[in-house]
Design a protein with these regions (language model features):
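DUTPase catalytic domain/fold
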Residues: 1-143
């Protein structure tokens, strides 16, 4: 699928690293190091603006290697870029470790995944259909 993109400051375009990759890594569009102290949250720009077709979204997701090795995640867990958003994509980075982490210019800090979405049309009813599970949740099926 073609998605229109504007690169800012010669930012490298994201690309799929393997034929089976679902996500494309995005890079920090910063001119100098950004140090994240433990527990710190900062918005890191990635230097891309996109025009996503209606009926789709792009999810911004943490990179598993950064999370495992350095405790770097995203404060909002997963970010959604809506099809009508035209601003620069940013990553809401959070340092969940007990050590400072330095984000370098051009470092791969998150990944983008394109998803098809549908909008909900609510149908108000008096009762919902029954299931074996019912309202059981929050640990209902095990630990």
């Amino acid at each position: 699928m073609q998605v229109k993109v504007i690169r800012m400051n010669e930012t490298e375009l994201p690309k799929y690293e393997t034929i089976g990759s679902a996500g494309m890594d995005v890079r920090a569009n910063i001119t100098e190091d950004v140090v994240l102290a433990p527990g710190t949250i900062k918005l890191i720009p990635v230097g891309l603006k996109v025009e996503i077709p209606v009926g789709y979204e792009i999810q911004v997701r943490p990179r598993s290697g950064l999370a495992l090795k350095h405790g770097l995640g995203m404060a909002n867990s997963i970010g959604t870029i809506d099809s009508d958003y035209r601003g620069e994509i940013g990553v809401i980075a959070i340092n969940l470790s007990d050590k400072a982490y330095t984000i370098k210019p051009g470092e791969r800090i998150a990944q983008l995944v394109l998803n098809k979405v549908e909008q909900i049309e609510w149908v108000e009813v008096e009762a919902l259909g029954t299931t074996e599970r019912g309202a059981g949740g929050y640990g209902h099926t095990g630990k």
